[in-house]
Design a protein with these regions (language model features):
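Feature captures hydrophobic
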Residues: 1-145
């Protein structure tokens, strides 16, 4: 069975690739962050949510949010399935998304992808670790589809 975005096993597969690409992530720096990836439906409601924890240079945990009572994310990254799929399709094709479709660019505009957080200082971790998050997603180009 092939792991699919945003399943926890998909993020755990990225974590194994992250381990293999250790030097890249060591150059980016230590990342300690807890976040949720949310796929939003056309009605604005969460369709799927996965809790992910980066612990240093590795994915320490990934689990469906419904199976993680008490998970306290620093932020939640929200986008519709077409937005996520466009980014992942570009990564599969080119190894990275087009510049205007990166996590950073999309969050800056805030229309197609946005952040939610109850604490501005914790939300700031998104910007602090943005390149690590993008490189983690870029590893998805190495996963079977």
């Amino acid at each position: 069975m092939v792991a699919k975005f945003p399943d926890a096993v998909w993020f755990l597969a990225l974590g194994r690739l992250m381990d293999a690409e250790g030097e890249l992530f060591r150059r980016l720096g230590y990342a300690e962050v807890r976040f949720v990836v949310r796929v939003v439906g056309d009605d604005g409601r969460a369709e799927r949510e996965t809790a992910v924890e980066l612990d240093g240079y590795r994915v320490g945990r990934a689990v469906a949010l419904e199976n993680a009572p008490g998970f306290d994310p620093d932020f939640t990254i929200c986008a519709t399935a077409p937005v996520w799929n466009r980014m992942l399709d570009e990564i599969a094709r080119d190894g990275r998304p087009e510049a205007r479709h990166t996590l950073s660019s999309l969050a800056l505009i805030g229309q197609e992808l946005w952040l939610e957080s109850s604490d501005q200082l914790r939300e700031d971790k998104y910007y602090r670790y943005n390149q690590t998050l993008q490189e983690l997603l870029n590893l998805s180009g190495k996963l079977p589809r």
